[in-house]
Amino acid sequence: MEYTEVMVRYGELSTKGKNRKDFINRLATNVERVLKDFPQIEFHPRHDRMHIILNGAPFTEVDKRLKKVFGIQTYSPAIKIPKTLEDIEKTSLELMKETFKPGMTFKINTKRSDHKFEYDTNQLNNLVGDFLFDNIDNLKAEMKHPDLVLRIEVRQDAVYISNQLLHGVGGMPVGTAGKAVMMLSGGIDSPVASWLALKRGVDIEMVHFFSPPYTTEKALAKAKELTGILANYAGKINFIAVPFAEIQETIKEKLPEGYLMTVQRRFMLQLADRIRAMRGGLAIFNGESVGQVASQTLESMVAINDVTTTPVIRPVATMDKTEIIAKAEEIGTFDLSIQPFEDCCTIFAPPRPKTKPKLDKAREYEARLDVEGLIQRALDGIEVMPIYPNQKFLDDKAQEDADLL
């Protein structure tokens, strides 16, 4: 049967008290944005749920997009019918036959906001249930843990019937928790951290460091394409490319090998913080996981974080690598993340970086450099571009070459 509307139930919005209206409006805006390709759709956000009137739009396509909107707890496609027992019984039977398999159990859940309707909820449950038993063989009722739930809502204007309860991704609507920058590499961890930041309602902008000619255009395209995958969950994400080659060359030329990584990361964090301030962000996110590599030990974090008082949030800090990989596969970033295009974090990596760098040493070595000049020249060269869902930047040839490596 062709569904006529979708009933969307909110996630954590119920806990937000007086800010609830703002959160609902933001969610409605985000839903409208992901469904903008269907101009016939109407949106009606209300206190307890949102009604999406399909007006002929295919639910299968709408479903694919709603699954990626943060702030949705559950949703149900429904059919609007006239308020007669005959129509209710007929539609209920058609929906049940679409999903019922022998041995399945069911229950009917009726709600009635129109108390002038001729049948109350118990009467309607019994009448429709008896009709289904008469027309479907081997049908069994189960009140506690049924396989199928037929939901009937009697409203003032019509009756709405649904046979599915679909789960959204939960979380908070993107944009309700403020704005931040995300330090995005081309690896596995930072895209997962980005997804987790979006899930908490943070409006993130990607900061990506690239170092031509040491890194290729393919490496930059890979980072942009990762952003395109994540934009499925946000509608649009700004991508900020930061030239980093001069800083890396200077550090390699003038500082001891053991502190190359530490000082390099200090520069990255300072640049991310400057960009955050320029863009009106409140925090910095990254994909660091405690102890995973030399620059992510607690001692390294102390030596690197020293350059800012801005909150640095690490969503995957306590996750095992296997957990991060599983999430990357789930959200669709893993296959692209493992494509072997070198990023700026690997090209100048020393063979024996300090795992327990000293803060005073890091400060001392950094002070030998023209810190402000290097940072300003990098900022002068940044490029900002909006990236939209599934936007492509790697051509097929680049993908084929990467698969062969």
Swiss-Prot record:
ATP binds at residues 183-184, 208-209, 265, 287, 296. One of its GO terms (biological process) is thiazole biosynthetic process. It comes from the Bacteria. The keyword Lyase does not apply. Its main location: cytoplasm. It is found in: Cytoplasm. PROSITE patterns: THUMP (PS51165). This is Probable tRNA sulfurtransferase. One of its GO terms (molecular function) is CCA tRNA nucleotidyltransferase activity. One of its GO terms (cellular component) is cytosol. Keywords: ATP-binding, Cytoplasm, Nucleotide-binding, RNA-binding, Thiamine biosynthesis, Transferase, tRNA-binding.
